[in-house]
């Protein structure tokens, strides 16, 4: 019973509900303390019914501010598009009438409003300050450059231009070894390099141990150019020095029946004199090869040379002889080797071979 009485007393001491009619903070007539707390009012409004007019007004103001910002951004984009369109129309108008084109229109392209590139000729005419102030790396290595005359680097010290930029005068000047000179043995800057070239007494561009190798490549390049020029000039001279063929267009040098030894013999001066003294008969393709030799040589060859069908055996057996047997039999006669020796001497007397040999000896020397 005592427990039941205690529970009743606790229930009587509970604070009155806000929904009761007699309480001071009930319903619409709430106290100022409860009205001043926004969290309590918002929580009660969200739980009880629709949001308050203040919340609705705040949300409307926020949406309006967002719309104003979007509208301002769109206005800026429209103004920029109008400016671009105006520039394009102006460029199109000036391209149709270039006389009235102002200076500003030169920097605007008629398409997409991009600046125009200068013509190729004008761009090539504008040479930078570093033009021909450094030796070409490819030319320095092997004296060959794919750009040739159009290379922007110098091909030799005679093409070097004075550098307008002074060498850097700072505390680190000439305090570090040049990587190109020390690793590869070549540096295209030479004396103008900002780094140290150790032991560069013979050549400032090439290391001493690489000098011989590079000089050989340069000499071979010079020799190749010299031979090419000689070939070109020789072909032009031969085209003017050709003589008409004798005996109705028959020329002995164009004969397909002539051997290699005959061709080398015909190039010698003595053979040319013999050919002039012994002109071929109109039926010379049917004659033997001894017809074109001097009388004494023809008699020796007729006595010594044998047919490939003859036999060297004393018993007189006939048959086809092997090639090495006939070659050995021919080599046993002394006049034939003397004839070949004479051809070799005549080949050595041709003008031009000694000249080329002297040029090769000169170019293969060191610089």
Curated annotation (Swiss-Prot):
Tissue expression per record: Exclusively expressed in the hermaphrodite gonad. Weakly distributed throughout gonadal oocytes from the mitotic stage to the developing diakinesis stage, with expression restricted to the distal region of the gonad.
Deletion phenotype: In adult hermaphrodites, double RNAi-mediated knockdown with oma-1 results in a 20% reduction in number of eggs laid. Triple RNAi-mediated knockdown with oma-1 and oma-2 results in a 85% reduction in number of eggs laid.
Listed name of the protein: CCCH-type zinc finger protein moe-3
Keywords: Coiled coil, Metal-binding, Repeat, Zinc, Zinc-finger
Organism domain of life: Eukaryota
GO MF term list: mRNA 3'-UTR binding; zinc ion binding
Biased composition (Low complexity): 30-49, 252-268
Encoding gene per record: moe-3
Zinc finger annotations (C3H1-type) as residue ranges: 130-158, 172-200
Species of the source: Caenorhabditis elegans
Residue ranges of the TM segments: none
Record's function text: Zinc-finger protein that may play a role in oocyte maturation and fertility.
